[in-house]
């Protein structure tokens, strides 16, 4: 498609710019005089607005929410537009779900095990437990309907993650089999851990699975590129490392013990550096979202949350209550935390749920509004614009215009034969029968 044809397509689609485009094509002197207001309106109608004001999940201001029941909510995950929490002890409904972190609904589980951890991956929620016989795994495609699955062994499965097409769970018990993996969350296979430490947390990031433990001597970290073969790594201290997360190119682990060193970080999962926590609380969980690491704990007075933009420098935040905050996750603009006990609310949130969806909807609405305004302007000005075009062309009835040729007027020689006009490259001869015109 040549320049003229592209111009024709533009004109056919955007009549509001007729006067400006044609005046440029036919009279180069008009280029400097051309205004861009019409083109600006049209371009605005072609794109969604990306500069809308957005709220953010800051991890600073927290709000208490009412759980579905006063169960011991031990873990929470987010996936497919839903927050899902599981409990280690309950009177009923050992699972609860929420689309916004505010309104929670109890769900029935296939067994009343002590569900210790949950993860989402490949369209599936998978939870693991520390109790039960041959049924320490359950899965759900929607967080509502759950199915019991056979675990590789009856170990105390305390953590699970998903990465590289694989679910990987780790445990605090067992002999040489404290890891199990599954490609689908249904069929599980025992794997040999680097050591028989109490592996209580695992994450995946940058092509690597990283697990941390609360026992062991200088080897409280292990890593694996495939979830099958594991290697011991040196931890910075023999703390009770209870949670690990990956974000912004960094692995960050937190512990419930230690003095001034309850955080450690690593860019590769292998080499770790001690960091100072905001307080010597018993930090039990950490997550990353919206450019922020957030950790929660079960001890401390009014400061059971700490946040960090880089995993290195940490700041204490005020929790809604001094509850036993055991797990935190992030999803769609919202941090959500659950507790196993304490007074008042057993859920707290920070941020605004649905930022992505709301921003998209608002952008689409704004684009539609701008497009409608452009269309109204086009209709109102079309007659006036066409009248101005007639004024720009002295003898439009005597001129045969080919846009593919007309665009060449900006840089070519004009050749005339009767009522027909053509343009050739400067320096070239006019076609036979045509006369060069200045």
Can you annotate each of these PLM segments?
Residues 1-31:
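N-terminal secretory signal peptides that target proteins for export/translocation
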Residues 359-392:
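Long, low-complexity, compositionally biased polyampholytic IDRs enriched for Lys/Glu and Gln/Arg
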């Amino acid at each position: 498609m040549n320049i003229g044809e592209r111009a024709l397509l533009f004109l056919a689609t955007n009549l509001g710019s007729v006067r400006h485009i044609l005046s440029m094509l036919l009279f180069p002197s008009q280029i400097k005089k051309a205004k861009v207001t019409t083109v600006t309106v049209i371009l605005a109608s072609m794109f969604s607005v990306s500069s809308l004001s957005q709220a953010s999940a800051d991890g600073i201001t927290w709000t208490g929410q009412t759980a579905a029941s006063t169960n011991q909510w031990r873990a929470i995950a987010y996936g497919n537009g839903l927050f899902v929490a599981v409990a280690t002890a309950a009177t009923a409904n050992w699972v609860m779900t929420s689309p916004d972190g505010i309104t929670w609904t109890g769900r029935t589980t296939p067994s009343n095990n002590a569900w210790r951890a949950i993860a989402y991956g490949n369209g599936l929620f998978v939870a693991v437990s520390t109790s039960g016989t041959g049924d320490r795994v359950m899965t759900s495609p929607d967080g509502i309907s759950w199915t019991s699955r056979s675990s590789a062994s009856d170990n105390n499965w305390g953590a699970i993650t998903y990465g590289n097409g694989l679910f990987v769970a780790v445990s605090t018990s067992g002999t040489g089999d404290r890891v199990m993996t599954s490609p689908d969350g249904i069929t599980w296979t025992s794997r040999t851990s680097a050591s028989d430490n109490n592996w209580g947390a695992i994450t995946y990031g940058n092509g690597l699975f990283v697990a941390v433990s609360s026992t062991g001597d200088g080897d409280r970290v292990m890593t694996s590129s495939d979830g099958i073969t594991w290697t011991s790594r040196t931890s910075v201290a023999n703390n009770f490392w209870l949670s690990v997360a990956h974000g912004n190119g960094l692995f960050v682990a937190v512990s419930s013990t230690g003095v001034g060193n309850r955080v450690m970080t690593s860019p590769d999962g292998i080499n770790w550096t001690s960091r100072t926590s905001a307080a010597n609380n018993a930090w039990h969980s950490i997550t990353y979202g919206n450019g922020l690491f957030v950790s929660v704990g079960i001890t401390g007075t009014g400061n059971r949350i700490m946040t960090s933009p880089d995993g290195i420098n940490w700041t204490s935040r005020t929790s809604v209550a001094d509850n036993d905050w055991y797990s935190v996750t992030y999803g769609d603009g919202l941090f959500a935390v659950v507790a196993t006990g304490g007074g008042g609310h057993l859920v707290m949130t920070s941020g605004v749920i649905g930022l992505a969806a709301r921003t998209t909807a608002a952008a689409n609405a704004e684009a539609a509004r701008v497009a409608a305004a452009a269309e109204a302007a086009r209709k109102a000005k079309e007659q006036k614009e066409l009248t101005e075009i007639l004024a720009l062309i002295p003898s439009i009835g005597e001129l045969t215009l080919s846009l593919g040729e007309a665009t060449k007027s900006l840089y070519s020689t004009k050749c005339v034969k009767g009522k027909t006009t053509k343009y050739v490259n400067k320096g070239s001869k006019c076609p036979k029968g045509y006369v060069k015109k200045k």
